[in-house]
Amino acid sequence: MFISCKPTNTRNLVSKEMTAEKLLGNTNYQAICYGGYRANSREIQPTISEIKEDLRILSALNIKVLRTYNVHYEEVVNLLKAITELKKEDENFEMYLMLGAWIDCKNAWTNLQPIHNEESKRNAIEIEEAVRLTNKYPEIIKIIAVGNEAMVKWATSYYVTPNIILKWVNHLQNLKKENKLPKQVWITSSDNFASWGGHTADYHVEDLNQLIKAVDYISMHTYPMHDTHYHPIFWGIKENELQFPEKEKVDAAMLRARNYAINQYESVVSYMKSIGVNKPVHIGETGWATKSNEHYGNDGSKATDEYKSALYYDLMREWSNKNNISCFYFEAFDENWKDAANPLGSENHFGLINLQSQAKYVLWKNVDSGTFKGLTRDGKPITKTYNGDEKALWLDVKTPNSILKN
């Protein structure tokens, strides 16, 4: 099921020549969100050798651009070291980073009331470290993202108003002008489609307009999977599909989910153009979990399973590649620290490969074709979930209950 866009008659540009402008929208350089945590706590950091295993797997899938989220921990430094080591081992190895700097409001993650129009003192440290790393590894880091879903108002524990993101974007753009940061590094913020003006008018403020003008491109997020619960206008079976075989019902539902994501993308483009701006818009994050015991599972919207997840992946890759849009798919590997107290929570199950080194359905064909031959994760070869039994997989695929008008 995995769509791999192998370069055809195209010489891969060497790292020093490669820029964000050349990377983004280039189907020879597929993108993904990456976290290498194996344990249920980020206190246990992935080692350089573990990260190198991950990088070899991703490279085999023709994924060459990774998105990270913060510089709090050793993970990003170890990731940069791992890439550097692999480049020394193989001069043709390529991997680039969209480096995230985490942004919080004042009092975020404390017992105090969050103050959304003031910022955490930690933000300055994040930005300073992002600059240091970018200057140290300019051949790897090609993009800096200021904040992750840092402006969306449902992030009640930490979101900031757009002026705070704008402050740091302008700071980084000024460093480029002062030759204190590589001029070809692109600066953005990676946020929900609503935060970029694609939804309600309460987001349409002048600071957002100035931010859109200040970034080098827009990195927007779209999650139809979450909206199968929160805004399920697209989710369900149409009246004229009720007699379809179950697989066709699911396929039709997933096509509508993909189209819902496209509509959110287009809503951001539309708002951007409405304020007189025309610059690239790429997908900084989208994904579809394979398990959930919450809103999205069998007791909820019946959205999460390996078949639907694989289909969403393929549909999004097909559309984004066709339109030269980079899609940083969420995510490469399952990480169970995200909802450590609830092992079946959806946040733990967005990866293409699980923590048992098993390729989910989306990658079964890659197992068959030998993509992972000789590669291991945590010492284990990459095998298939469900022992490759598609009938067993389909026992976990449920059809949405909702009936939609034709």
Predicted regions and their residues:
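Substrate-binding cleft of extracellular glycoside hydrolase catalytic domains
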Residues: 78-185, 283
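Aromatic-rich peripheral "rim/lid" segments of glycoside hydrolase catalytic domains that contact
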Residues: 10-21, 26-27, 294-315, 319-406
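Boundary/entry segment of secreted carbohydrate-active catalytic domains
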Residues: 8-54
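Catalytic domains of carbohydrate-active enzymes, especially glycoside hydrolases
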Residues: 50-75
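Acidic-and-aromatic substrate-binding clefts and catalytic sites of carbohydrate-active enzymes
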Residues: 43-46, 67-79, 105-107, 121-123, ...
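Conserved, mostly hydrophobic/aromatic
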Residues: 66, 144, 218, 283-285, ...
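Noncatalytic carbohydrate-binding groove/subsite architecture in carbohydrate-active enzymes
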Residues: 120-122, 151-283, 289, 293
